[in-house]
Amino acid sequence: MDQNWMNNTTVIVTGASGGMGKGIAESLIVDHGCTVIGIARSEEKMKKVVEELGPNAEKFSYKLFDVSVEQNWIDFAKYLEDNDIHPDILVNNAGILPKFDRFEHYSMADIEKAMNINFYSAVYSIHTLLPMI
């Protein structure tokens, strides 16, 4: 397979404001020539990503929303469609890791939040965006 097959592809990366998501987004842009749309909640962190990308920032844009809300994915798909953006790859990276504790010490709210972000956000994104990819 051609090593440059990813060049000029459009990739959506969730959790792109830090950690692995930020690293994935940066590598896709710098090492592979991709255009990346980062998804996160913090505008401050996303602006920092743009700043750190320097001259490569032209290949990065971002949308701010909570990935655990299905309607946000529907709205994002409409944004892509309205702007004639055709994603090629989806990287479902967003996730949270609750503090380590005995299971019985977790509240149902903690468990629901982790499931919504770590599981349902991937389901919502794939279900909504797969027809476009």
Region roles according to the model:
Residues 10-13, 90-91:
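Conserved hydrophobic beta-strands of the Rossmann-like cofactor-binding core
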Residues 17-19:
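Conserved glycine-rich cofactor-binding loop
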Residues 44, 64-75, 108:
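The beta1-alpha1 cofactor-binding region of Rossmann-like NAD(H)/NADP(H)-dependent oxidoreductases
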Residues 94-99:
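Conserved NAD(P)H cofactor-binding loop of Rossmann-fold oxidoreductase domains
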Residues 101-103, 107-113:
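Substrate-binding pocket helix/loop in short-chain dehydrogenase/reductase
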Residues 126-127:
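A short, exposed helix-loop element centered on a Lys and neighboring polar residues
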